[in-house]
């Protein structure tokens, strides 16, 4: 059985997706439900996800899919979940006019948005463009995507502001891996991953930034760094 706030949030998400085709942000949810902080929204979203009413989609910090509705909200039989656009496509977009075809030794990957190498930000968003990546960076049939780096917290690992990182999609990591981590369900960051018992440490590669140590249920791995592209 859902609480009143859970029903209100589900109703708000459904209405916004029906109107705009995309779910509301955590800030918009907070204002709509008159809550003081986004942590309250995070708890409500997690509860709805655990009960099977919504599902969070990978690589999009705001990506929510309505799986089912309670009887009090259902419009009748035949309800179909509405998925927001902008998830990773099966095929790259057509080449723009005047562009040259990429050689067989490279493949085009979608650039899914920006990732913070600094203070975590609500970062991963819709596909902005595609980028040619050498096939030697990629691992077999695994799914990959790219992100633009913003910030300088990983400079001692050779990752600079403005670089494009190539990420292999995976939901687990080994200590020492540089990963895309989603913190509290809405903040995305690029950091070195360390497990310490039931805690996760997200380490910067810049002494100006502190290591963040969080409970494991607050951190969701979105992928592992496998390559980097830099423009001069």
Swiss-Prot record:
Entry keyword annotation includes DNA damage: yes
Keywords assigned: Autocatalytic cleavage, DNA damage, DNA repair, DNA replication, DNA-binding, Hydrolase, Repressor, SOS response, Transcription, Transcription regulation
CDD domains named among the record's database cross-references: S24_LexA-like
Entry's EC annotation: 3.4.21.88
DNA-binding region: 26-46
Catalysed transformations (reactions): Hydrolysis of Ala-|-Gly bond in repressor LexA
Example of a GO biological process term: DNA replication
Domain of life the protein comes from: Bacteria
Residue numbers annotated as active site: 153, 191
Site (Cleavage): 117-118
EC class: hydrolase
Gene Ontology CC terms, in alphabetical order: protein-DNA complex
Molecular-function GO term, any one: serine-type endopeptidase activity
Signal peptide (from-to): none
Function according to Swiss-Prot or TrEMBL: Represses a number of genes involved in the response to DNA damage (SOS response), including recA and lexA. In the presence of single-stranded DNA, RecA interacts with LexA causing an autocatalytic cleavage which disrupts the DNA-binding part of LexA, leading to derepression of the SOS regulon and eventually DNA repair.
Quaternary structure (record): Homodimer.
Family under the similarity heading: Belongs to the peptidase S24 family.
HAMAP family (alphabetical): LexA
Official protein name in the record: LexA repressor
Species, as recorded: Paracoccus denitrificans (strain Pd 1222)
Taxonomic lineage of the native organism: Bacteria, Pseudomonadati, Pseudomonadota, Alphaproteobacteria, Rhodobacterales
């Amino acid at each position: 059985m859902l609480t009143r706030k859970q029903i209100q949030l589900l109703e708000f998400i459904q209405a916004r997706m029906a109107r705009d085709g995309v779910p509301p942000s955590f800030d918009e949810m907070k204002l709509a439900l008159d809550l003081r902080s986004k942590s309250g929204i995070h708890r409500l979203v997690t509860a709805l996800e655990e009960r099977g009413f919504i599902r969070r989609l990978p690589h999009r910090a705001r990506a929510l899919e309505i799986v089912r509705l309670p009887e009090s909200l259902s419009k009748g039989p035949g309800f179909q979940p509405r998925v927001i656009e902008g998830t990773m496509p099966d095929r790259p977009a057509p080449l723009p006019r005047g562009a040259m075809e990429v050689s067989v030794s490279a493949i085009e990957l979608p650039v899914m948005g920006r990732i913070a190498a600094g203070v975590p930000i609500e970062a991963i968003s819709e596909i902005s463009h595609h980028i040619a990546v050498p096939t030697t960076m990629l691992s077999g049939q695994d799914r990959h995507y790219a992100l633009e780096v913003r910030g300088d917290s990983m400079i001692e690992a050779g990752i600079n502001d403005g670089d494009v990182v190539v990420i292999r999609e995976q939901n687990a990591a080994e200590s020492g891996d540089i990963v895309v981590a989603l913190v509290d369900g809405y903040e995305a960051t690029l950091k070195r991953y360390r497990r310490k018992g039931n805690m996760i440490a997200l380490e910067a590669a810049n002494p100006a930034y502190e290591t963040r140590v969080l409970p494991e249920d607050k951190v969701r791995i979105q992928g592992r760094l496998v390559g980097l592209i830099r423009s001069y």
